[in-house]
Amino acid sequence: MKWLLLLGLVALSECIMYKVPLIRKKSLRRTLSERGLLKDFLKKHNLNPARKYFPQWKAPTLVDEQPLENYLDMEYFGTIGIGTPAQDFTVVFDTGSSNLWVPSVYCSSLACTNHNRFNPEDSSTYQSTSETVSITYGTGSMTGILGYDTVQVGGISDTNQIFGLSETEPGSFLYYAPFDGILGLAYPSISSSGATPVFDNIWNQGLVSQDLFSVYLSADDQSGSVVIFGGIDSSYYTGSLNWVPVTVEGYWQITVDSITMNGEAIACAEGCQAIVDTGTSLLTGPTSPIANIQSDIGASENSDGDMVVSCSAISSLPDIVFTINGVQYPVPPSAYILQSEGSCISGFQGMNLPTESGELWILGDVFIRQYFTVFDRANNQVGLAPVA
């Protein structure tokens, strides 16, 4: 009987998981559009999402070119606490980057004044460093310092976590951003200044029982989405998880066999590489095949630069199917056409990301909303299953 009780306790300990609820909010793009500021923003800022994946390093100032404009369309955000007592911040949980950044009281830029700012003097556990970091984007740089403190995330106390405290943030557009900072969940190999990512620090301290985390993004307008640290909750998906090997341990990069529509290959006919990225809202790929897809679904560019589709056409459009590791993952038109306040916008975006293995695709939130996703660091693989 004692052995049965012990085994039960062990099984229970292995099932412990920490959930961080995500709230879906109005994107920065939508806010700027409603305020009549989007056109001016697009003129001033040359949007190039590719810079997120291929940063330009400039030693010794440790410059990392990761433009925050990449988060223009983000809608899912969670709350973390930093310091003792905890100071709360709304962040993007981003599997396409590896650093944790929040504004600080040392920042007097307009964008910082409208967001939560970390005050080291209010935390009894903060440790300063002499390191500085700069993130280049748009027409200037977000400069900051690095420090260590306790990060509260989903009930986990992540002690001695290195993070960035911004000192300057250029451009007024971030004033309207629905988030304070970024929490990166990619591999440590792409971390700026060699900073240990949050999940790595959590695992290294033995705070979770499994070296993995999982993501469920709800199509609901506000609630239901979640990041799960250290576990998998089968109530969020149907069927079984299909596992896909990570091909490059930097981003969560995998191989896509093909992309088809009506049974015909429309892209990636001989296979291609893709990054599964919660920090990118759309499905992005090389400009040429994306242009063909836009044409196939009847999308045309409007004055704001969005690719719009007739809302009445959605019901007649076909699924676009991503075949990954031999398994088909259909994305229906109700998912790849984004509907908002009477307008319908294509969820595809052209972006050239050349690598030694060919052009990269990005499977962003449009895809992840359809498929519960497990990011398994222990086995360097991604698990996918249809959402429940």
Swiss-Prot record:
Transmembrane segments: none annotated. Keywords: Aspartyl protease, Digestion, Disulfide bond, Hydrolase, Protease, Secreted, Signal, Zymogen. Its main location: secreted. Residues 1-15 form the signal peptide. It is an enzyme of class 3 (hydrolase). GO terms for molecular function: aspartic-type endopeptidase activity. Residues 76-385 form the Peptidase A1 domain. The active site is at D94, D277. GO terms for cellular component: extracellular exosome; multivesicular body lumen. It catalyses: Preferential cleavage: hydrophobic, preferably aromatic, residues in P1 and P1' positions. Cleaves 1-Phe-|-Val-2, 4-Gln-|-His-5, 13-Glu-|-Ala-14, 14-Ala-|-Leu-15, 15-Leu-|-Tyr-16, 16-Tyr-|-Leu-17, 23-Gly-|-Phe-24, 24-Phe-|-Phe-25 and 25-Phe-|-Tyr-26 bonds in the B chain of insulin. GO terms for biological process: digestion; proteolysis. Belongs to the peptidase A1 family. This is Pepsin A-3.
